[in-house]
A protein has these predicted regions:
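Generic N-terminal amphipathic, Lys/Arg-enriched alpha-helix
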Residues: 3-14, 39-44
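Short coil/turn connectors at secondary-structure junctions
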Residues: 4-8, 34, 64-68, 94-95, ...
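Glycine-rich phosphate/diphosphate-binding loop of Rossmann-like nucleotide-binding domains
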Residues: 9-31, 132-198
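Buried hydrophobic positions in well-ordered alpha/beta secondary-structure cores of metabolic enzymes
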Residues: 15-18, 67, 120, 148, ...
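N-terminal beta-loop-helix "entrance" segment that forms/cooperates
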Residues: 35-58, 204
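Short, small-residue-enriched loops and turns at beta-alpha junctions
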Residues: 47, 77-78, 167-172, 202
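N-terminal glycine-rich phosphate/adenylate-binding segment common to multiple enzyme folds
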Residues: 48-132
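Glycine-rich phosphate-binding loop
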Residues: 62-78, 190-217
C-alpha cells in the first residue's frame, strides 16, 4: 500500500553508466526527505535479454499508470537489439519537446559562471527525417514552437535563439525556420534571432552567457 501523500515514481535504472547514476540520484531523493514510493520498471538491455523487448508491455503499463519517472540512459537498440526504447517511450507518452535548464552555480571560478539558458528541442519529428513530407512536418513544428515560445514567456525569458542547419539543408530546415518565425510573431514580447547550429554550439562552449533560450531539433 502506498504511503499517504507519497509520490509514486517509476524507476528505470537504464544501461551503461545508467544504474550507477540513477541509484545515486534515487538515494539523493530519499535523503531529501521527499516521500516517494518507487516502482522498479524493467527496461533496457536487461529486459531485452529476458523478454526480447527493451521496453515491453509491463514497462509501458507502469509508465502509463504512474506518469512520473526517474529514468537513466537506455541503449539505442542498434545492432539488431530491437527497437530503440527511447523512441518507444517518447511515442508512448506523446513527448514532442525536451526541456533542459542549463545553469551554472557560483563559487567555482568557472569561465561559464552566469550561464542561465533554457534549451528546448523538438523530439517527435526531425526536420531532416521529414524531408518530402511538408504538410506532416509543419504541424509538429508549429506545435513545438508554440509550446517553446509559451514556455519562454512563462519562465520570464526575453530572447529566443533558433539553431538550424539551413545552410546544408535549405528546403527542409527552411520550412522549420519559417515555422519558428511565424511563432515569433505570435509572441511579440520576445526578441527573436536565428543562427546556424554550428555557431550556436561554438558560442555555447565559449560564452554561453549570451544565450537566454535556445530552440533546436
Amino acid at each position: 500500500m502506498a504511503e499517504l501523500g507519497a509520490h509514486r515514481v517509476a524507476f528505470i535504472a537504464g544501461d551503461g553508466v545508467g544504474p550507477e547514476v540513477a541509484w545515486a540520484a534515487r538515494r539523493c531523493v530519499d535523503a531529501s526527505g521527499a516521500r516517494v514510493e518507487w516502482t522498479d520498471v524493467p527496461a533496457g538491455q536487461e529486459a531485452f535479454g529476458r523478454t526480447g523487448d527493451a521496453f515491453g508491455a509491463a514497462a509501458a503499463a507502469a509508465l502509463s499508470r504512474l506518469r512520473l519517472a526517474l529514468k537513466a540512459p537506455l541503449e539505442s537498440g542498434t545492432g539488431g537489439r530491437g527497437r530503440n526504447p527511447n523512441i518507444v517511450l517518447r511515442e508512448l507518452l506523446g513527448v514532442y519537446a525536451a526541456v533542459r535548464h542549463c545553469r551554472s552555480y557560483g563559487g567555482r571560478g568557472s569561465p561559464w559562471e552566469g550561464m542561465d539558458v533554457l534549451v528546448m528541442m523538438q523530439e517527435n519529428v526531425s526536420p531532416l527525417s521529414a524531408a518530402g513530407e511538408e504538410p506532416a512536418a509543419e504541424t509538429p513544428a508549429r506545435r513545438f514552437f508554440d509550446f517553446a515560445f509559451g514556455r519562454a514567456v512563462a519562465a520570464g525569458r526575453r530572447r529566443v535563439t533558433v539553431a538550424h542547419r539551413a545552410a546544408s539543408a535549405a528546403s527542409v530546415e527552411g520550412r522549420w525556420l519559417r515555422a519558428a518565425e511565424e511563432a515569433s510573431r505570435r509572441f511579440p514580447g520576445l526578441s527573436f534571432e536565428d543562427q546556424l547550429a554550428g555557431h550556436v554550439a561554438m558560442q555555447m562552449a565559449r560564452a554561453p552567457q549570451r544565450f537566454d533560450v535556445i530552440l533546436a531539433a
